[in-house]
């Protein structure tokens, strides 16, 4: 038996989960926040307990040392050599990585070069990879890329209708994101439906603070809503989603606070979406509270959100020429029954109908009625388990 750590490292955080493999049992999980800042926080959950420490953690190497020491201190492992593999989530793999890979010096260098495609994510992932390689150099490190699942898209789908030199010279194209989540819930949907994935047409809706929707044909991604970056697609928690690109130079001309394109993109990424329109929050629970209070800005934000998601799902029915099931996953997808109800309410023409008694908070499974031609499923995503599985598969191929 072996133990594998799944890592999701950001610029100032390191989220982790420890598995017993191949049993896929979760032994512990936690997160280290505010890396590089004063009063960093390390949280460890195991055996029904929760331990929290306030520390000064200067970089990812210190964070990894604290994580490993905590595993021993709390008796979760007896020695480092019980850990046989580490899997790292990497947002952008570009066209270089069509599947998960074992890390070597060249892979790490390429991940850092691809930071231009995910400047908020890839540098943190690279820092986490370096830290584990420095501290545990003899164990297998594997990179699992958010974009890999979407490399099956056809060229006419992933290219933008701009001069091709921008793709040839600068690799401007649709890459997508959340691929690990979309892959996992599609596999789970096939099990739930009792049919081979290779026979199914699925639309998977990952609706959390980030939102992406994918058309899955026979187990492969044929289209997805996120694009060159995770800013594209429907409205999200703090991201605008798709807008007319001519808005960007217009805002630079009109608003003295927006000095250049980077300022506008920052606004579109961090100050837009549900948060920007409502002026309340990026959290759907706060938006729904605003609905109860008849807050007009909350109502407007909610209506735009529902409208954009319905439109995206509808276009993927056209891409797939129909679908066997629609899958909701991630924070809002799993835990916002009102949102699911209102999205489906605009898609009944496609033959979808949900059972109100099943469409409640906390329910997982098939929420459609027996008469529904298209099944509607709620499935909890598990990107960490996908990462651990890939480590188990690849760790003997070094």
Curated annotation (Swiss-Prot):
Binding site for Mg(2+): 8, 383
Catalytic residue list: 146 (proton donor/acceptor)
Cofactor note: Mg(2+). Can also accept Mn(2+).
SUPFAM superfamilies per record: Actin-like ATPase domain
GO cellular component annotations of the record: cytoplasm
Residues the entry annotates as binding substrate: 89
Enzyme class: transferase
Disulfide bonds: none
Residue numbers marked as site, Transition state stabilizer: 178, 239
Biological pathway: Metabolic intermediate biosynthesis; acetyl-CoA biosynthesis; acetyl-CoA from acetate: step 1/2
Source organism, top-level taxon: Bacteria
GO biological process, one term: acetyl-CoA biosynthetic process
One GO MF term: acetate kinase activity
EC number: 2.7.2.1
Family: Belongs to the acetokinase family.
Protein name: Acetate kinase
Designated gene of the protein: ackA
